[in-house]
């Protein structure tokens, strides 16, 4: 079992691991335990009642936060001609077609956070599935990253729209801002993310959809949150 740092052990004492905090308390506590020398990311972890073995119960979609995540998002676009120009004007960091696919495949280029493609590019990037898929970077219509409206997609992802997907245990891990954010902005982001997740409940899920909610910072302990206080 890995040893935690002295700093981690000190801040962990501030959190009652047996208690479910209301959202207001949890945000205060998250900001208080974020004592690292960098601006820690605040993450919302949601444990669902999804049966990941059933394909119709998996969540893969996009959400947007009213105040963004505080992270500069690097966007790569696979497009040609007019669509490539639209992507560049919209602020894409990298735009190309076969050249980009080759750079990824042969040079291991992965210096981006989101990959968007026009539908006609899928035959070119299909061979990149084994590289981009495991990293959650493969363009996908469900995630809004395969589209002809590349300009709108680039702007949305630059503003903070992000893809979310359940992991193999049915959990969601969502960055909701930085510890330096004002409390009100963090709270609004958390509530917005949670409400959007509720709207993504697969029809096949029986009983309670959300089993547990935890808030944490990059280097801090988990803080259990009472789900009822996320919709008040």
UniProtKB/Swiss-Prot annotation:
GO molecular-function terms, A-Z: rRNA binding; structural constituent of ribosome; tRNA binding
InterPro entries per record: Ribosom_uL1_bac-type (IPR005878), Ribosomal_uL1 (IPR002143), Ribosomal_uL1-like (IPR023674), Ribosomal_uL1/biogenesis (IPR028364), Ribosomal_uL1_3-a/b-sand (IPR016095), Ribosomal_uL1_CS (IPR023673)
GO biological process: regulation of translation; translation
Keywords: Repressor, Ribonucleoprotein, Ribosomal protein, RNA-binding, rRNA-binding, Translation regulation, tRNA-binding
Assigned GO CC terms: large ribosomal subunit
Subunit note: Part of the 50S ribosomal subunit.
Protein name per its UniProtKB record: Large ribosomal subunit protein uL1
Gene label: rplA
């Amino acid at each position: 079992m890995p040893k935690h740092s002295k700093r981690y052990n000190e801040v962990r004492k501030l959190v009652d691991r047996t208690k479910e905090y209301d959202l207001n308390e949890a945000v205060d506590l998250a900001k208080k335990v974020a004592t690292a020398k960098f601006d820690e990311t605040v993450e919302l972890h949601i444990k669902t009642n999804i049966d990941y073995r059933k394909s119709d119960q998996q969540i893969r979609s996009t959400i947007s936060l009213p105040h963004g995540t505080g992270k500069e998002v690097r966007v790569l676009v696979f497009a040609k001609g007019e669509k490539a120009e639209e992507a560049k004007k919209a602020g894409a960091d990298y735009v190309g077609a076969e050249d980009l696919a080759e750079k990824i495949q042969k040079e291991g280029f992965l210096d981006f956070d989101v990959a968007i493609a026009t539908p006609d590019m899928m035959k070119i990037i299909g061979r990149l599935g084994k590289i981009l898929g495991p990293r959650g970077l493969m363009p996908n219509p469900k995630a809004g990253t395969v589209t002809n409206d590349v300009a709108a997609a680039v702007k949305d992802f630059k503003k903070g729209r992000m893809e979310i997907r359940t992991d193999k245990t049915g959990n969601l891990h969502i960055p909701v801002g930085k510890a330096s954010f004002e409390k009100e902005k963090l709270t609004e982001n958390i509530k917005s993310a949670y409400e959007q997740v509720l709207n993504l409940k697969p029809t096949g899920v029986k009983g309670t959809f959300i089993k547990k909610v935890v808030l944490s910072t990059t280097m801090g302990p988990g803080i259990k949150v009472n789900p009822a206080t996320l919709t008040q």
